[in-house]
Amino acid sequence: MRQRTPFILSLTAIAAIAGLMPVAGVAQDEPGLDVFFAAISADGGAAKEALETLEANWRPGYAPMMVEFIRFLNTGSGADDQRLGPGGGNISSDSGGAVGGGAPDGDRDRIDSSRFANRRNPRVQAAERVIGFLEERTGQDFGDDYNAWRTWMWDQEYDPHPQYGFLKANLYANFDPSFQKFFNGESAVRLDEVEWGGVPVGGIPALDHPPTTSAGNASYLADGDIVFGVSINGEHRAYPKRILAWHELAWDSLGGNELTVVYCTLCGTVIPYNSEVGGRPVKFDTSGLLYRSNKLLYDEISNTLWSSLTGEPVVGPMVGYDVKLTPNAAVTTTWGDWKATHPDTTVLTLETGYERDYTEGAAYAAYFATDDLMFPVSVTDSRLANKAEILALRFSTSSGTRALAISADHLQSNRVFQINFAGRDLVVVTSPQGANRVYAASGYQFESMDANGKVVDSNGDTWVANEDLLVPDSDPTGGLTRLPAFRAFWFGWYAQYPDTELIGN
């Protein structure tokens, strides 16, 4: 998934950047991006002059840009096998190219130090210059350890260079020119925490209204296979994890609604959003970028980057507008549990149009097997294991968003769990197979679950938990409203909501 791609900048390419740079909003004393890119030139004289200019005008807000360069200098061997310009276009091999870079992946975020034996390699020389310069400016001694640099950087408060986003867009464009359409406009998050996930724009193929079949015809599924169940307006559908994990995104129609079903495999969330913004139909796709290990989508109208977990715009023209994607409820459960509850359900078939190993547990097997993260995040919390599953809820209040995480293990041991949170009386009902559904309790007190799986209140009355309502047997026409909630890995939820409350640690 994460493949190395050589990266070379030449003086010709640097000049091209200077011609492309927007100048509005840049103070007179701010070095232009041509200076930053010249600092990694193969021309030692030009690089020295650029670094002297940066030194004379240095402020902490320039450090993240230099750290970006350290990442892209990490190319391994073959420094001169391909030359790429800042916008992703090829530069001829005789144009004086310089540095290189590649996709980070685990230990490969460190530059191969054995390459420093070859002092004539222009990329090695550029790396040494940038690292030495950054160490002198910051007083840090991280050498070629990119992860150490960015972990340190995340602890710093600084005013970024006004064209930092433009620099990122042009660096990433060496892997896919489409990255240039991002990073325009405002940002609601720190740009130094937005990183490339190792795939091009749209590089993980989405499922476009995938074919479905009935429960009786889905012989490829075992009862213990994990599915994500969604119900809209009385229509039920199961999205098997073994399929969705390979695609991370499905555009679908269910119950008369157009849906964007997004699966962030890294942070463990499946959220079916309505495919509209402000009442207008909008198509979302995979950007190839992450924020704190959370998959970022982009809309095809404005090219704004959206958090797949919060449903909010984070970088681009839509930031600052009062817009947010509308989530629908989803449950994580077994195929046996889902089809028993909804015998009329439809389910995705294996006829996706793609060649993948759709056996249970094949996708991301190594990642799911350990508690290790594929991409570091700036904030973590040790009260639970990184990939411990939690049920995630959030509510808007007058003082902002209130976030709540409830351990899935806690809910499995307390299958009827009631709590007052953010001024709301909530009850979480959990099936024996672990499917969690949340309802507005509305003043009722719920105490237990009987042998038939019905919820029992403090008066001894029984209730049935369905996909829309918690319905009293005494009045099948009534019921308590179900609220959107979804599973997530603890680290992924905490990284987005570090002020979250946690129950069940």
Regions found by a protein language model. Give the residues of each.
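Alpha-helix N-cap/helix-start positions at coil->helix boundaries
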Residues: G44-G45, T75-A79, V124, E128, ...
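Alpha-solenoid repeat junctions
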Residues: L54-G61, L134, T138
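Bacterial N-terminal signal peptides
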Residues: S10-M21
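Mid-to-C-terminal functional-domain signal that highlights helix-capping/loop sites
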Residues: V67-L73, S93, A98-R120, G132-N505
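Sec/Tat signal peptide C-region and signal peptidase I cleavage site
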Residues: V23-A27
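Conserved hydrophobic register position within alpha-solenoid helical repeats
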Residues: A47-L51, A126-L134
